[in-house]
UniProtKB/Swiss-Prot annotation:
SMART domains linked to this entry: HTH_MARR
Regulation of protein activity: Zinc acts as a corepressor and is required for DNA-binding activity. Binds up to two zinc ligands per monomer. Inactive under zinc deprivation.
Protein name from the UniProt record: Transcriptional regulator ZitR
Amino-acid positions noted as binding Zn(2+) 1 in the UniProt annotation, renumbered to this chain: E23, H41, H107, H111
GO MF terms, alphabetically ordered: DNA binding; DNA-binding transcription factor activity; zinc ion binding
Family annotation (CDD domains): HTH_ARSR
Disulfide bonds listed in the record: none
Keywords: DNA-binding, Metal-binding, Repressor, Transcription, Transcription regulation, Zinc
Source species of the chain: Lactococcus lactis subsp. cremoris (strain MG1363)
DNA-binding region: 53-76
Amino acid sequence: MSLANQIDQFLGAIMQFAENKHEILLGECESNVKLTSTQEHILMILAAEVSTNARIAEQLKISPAAVTKALKKLQEQELIKSSRATNDERVVLWSLTEKAIPVAKEHAAHHEKTLSTYQELGDKFTDEEQKVISQFLSVLTEEFR
């Protein structure tokens, strides 16, 4: 099979795997709480800092409306709470509830496990081969911009 066909199959497999997901994580989520990947990512963001809808949308590179929808679902599950900014009552700040902390930690661990798997895969190649792979991925990424 040609390299072009392999790339096409690889990207097709990624598209199928990532359909309707914000990110690609390997393995299964270990949390018993059923959340979308966007909701999980919001929890991970809020574990690091209190944030606004607009800031979350910016970080996730999704629309504020999509964030609002995800926040509403998280609030219904009592995983997040809202408060008003002390310096501007119009600004709504979102933060985690105690119930959400273990879920957010699990999502962060899932990220680390995925990165560790990528590192293990990379370690199967020599430094020179890793440089070629890195260059290829950089060029391929530029083609998508």
